[in-house]
UniProtKB/Swiss-Prot annotation:
CXXCXGXG motif repeats lie at residues 149-156, 166-173, 188-195, 202-209. This is Chaperone protein DnaJ. The lineage of its organism: Bacteria, Pseudomonadati, Pseudomonadota, Alphaproteobacteria, Rickettsiales. Residues 4-68 form the J domain. GO terms for molecular function: ATP binding; heat shock protein binding; unfolded protein binding; zinc ion binding. It comes from Rickettsia rickettsii (strain Iowa). Its main location: cytoplasm. Zn(2+) 1 binds at C149, C152, C202, C205. PANTHER family: DNAJ HOMOLOG 1, MITOCHONDRIAL-RELATED. The keyword Cell wall biogenesis/degradation does not apply. A zinc finger (CR-type) spans 136-214. The J domain is necessary and sufficient to stimulate DnaK ATPase activity. Zinc center 1 plays an important role in the autonomous, DnaK-independent chaperone activity of DnaJ. Zinc center 2 is essential for interaction with DnaK and for DnaJ activity. GO terms for biological process: chaperone cofactor-dependent protein refolding; DNA replication; protein refolding; response to heat. Binds 2 Zn(2+) ions per monomer. Belongs to the DnaJ family.
Length: 373
């Protein structure tokens, strides 16, 4: 079994961005082709870069945690992402940002460091059975997502500290420069285009205002939900960055195939086996229904194999409605394979009576004659 990205970097699933970066820098230096002659260095270096490329990005990491390693890779390959080919980042580029943190250099990411960013929406696939879809149900689901930091309450700033307005751009996030007839606008170099500055980032969330954890959530599945229904839970998605609004959670419903019923909109179809005696003579038969229990169905005398009998308002419930669909029973007349002596005698008598009736009315011979005329 191949290693997942956390195992490749040697960190836990709850590792912070600082821990990820530290692990990446250590491994990148160890396996970079410019620093070692080991045979498998290039392969390991590619794997390390692929892992860090995903986990350093909050949205990619959330998708990776949600889908799992194999499913995420398949999705990336279909979308054309995640293929680094033979490209090797320069060793100086890898450690440039690392050294600038200590030296106050200008090698800084252009990614916003203080701006509020809305959290990503999440998708959860939930499978239920047909009875649960009929009655409706409360389901507890478990998933990993970014949650608002409970230490800084999403601000990204250390407790007691405030997020200050950038004095270089007055909170605009950009500066303007006049060159002749042209005005050039560029991102503020001091706040990186955000308009605000976090002087002391929160230690728990490293200034992001959120961190990843496993969540348990109770979701309500309404009665009459159909296969493929998407239910939106506002604000239950990824927490926003630095106080940004949370995304939404979308629960996609899949209904498992049923052993007895087939669903057609709000109607239910089922195969109903009956004896040839009941088919001929008619009668009452007990039929199971989706809400539980049984109801009586009248079988008309002379019912044929393949006939369809309807039980009104015994189908599926409809969302936000008191109306129900129907249940349609498809008759399957069963012919006995093993007859007792008495049963055979009775059928022989029935056979003779049937032949005599057809001979008397001439219908049988007329039909045969017409076949040869």
């Amino acid at each position: 079994m191949s290693q997942n990205y956390y195992q490749i970097l040697g960190v836990s699933k709850t590792a912070s961005q600082a821990d990820l970066k530290k692990a990446y820098l250590k491994l990148a230096k160890q396996y970079h082709p410019d620093t070692t002659d080991a045979k498998d260095a290039e392969k390991k270096f590619k794997a390390i870069n692929a892992a860090y490329d995903v986990l350093k990005d909050e949205q990619k990491r959330a998708a990776y945690d949600r889908l799992g390693h194999d499913a995420f890779q398949n999705q990336q390959s279909r979308g054309g992402g995640g293929n680094h080919g033979g490209f090797h980042p320069d060793i100086n580029d890898i450690f440039g940002d690392f050294f600038s943190d200590f030296m106050g250099g200008s090698r800084r990411s252009s990614r916003p460091t203080s701006a509020k960013v809305r959290g990503s929406d999440l998708k959860y696939n939930l499978t239920i059975n047909l009875e649960e879809a009929f009655h409706g149900i409360e389901k507890n689901i478990n998933f990993s997502s970014a949650v608002k930091c409970d230490t800084c309450h999403g601000s990204g700033s250390e407790k007691g500290e405030t997020v200050t307005t950038c004095d270089a751009c007055s909170g605009v996030g950009a500066t303007r420069m006049q060159q002749g007839f042209f005005t050039i606008e560029q991102a503020c170099h001091k706040c990186q285009g955000n308009g605000h500055i976090i002087k002391n980032p929160c230690k728990k969330c490293h200034g992001m205002g959120r961190y990843h954890k496993q969540r348990n959530l109770s979701v309500n599945i309404p009665a009459g939900v159909e296969n493929g229904t998407r239910i939106r839970h506002t604000g239950e998605g990824e927490a926003g960055i630095r106080g940004g609004n949370s995304g939404d959670l979308y629960v996609d419903i899949t209904i498992k195939p049923h052993d007895i019923y087939k669903v057609d909109g709000a109607n239910l179809h089922c195969k109903l086996p009956i004896s040839f005696v009941n088919a001929a003579l008619g009668g009452e038969i007990e039929v199971p229904v989706i809400e539980g229990g049984k109801v009586s169905l009248t079988i008309p005398a002379g019912t044929q194999n393949g006939d369809q009998l309807r039980l009104r308002s015994k189908g599926m419930s409809k969302m936000r409605s008191t109306i129900r669909g129907d249940m349609l029973t498809h008759i399957h007349v069963e012919v006995p394979k093993n007859l007792s002596k008495r049963q055979r005698e009775l059928l022989e008598e029935f056979k003779k009576e049937s032949i005599n009736e057809k001979e008397n009315d001439g219908s049988f011979f007329n039909k045969m004659k017409s076949l040869w005329s």
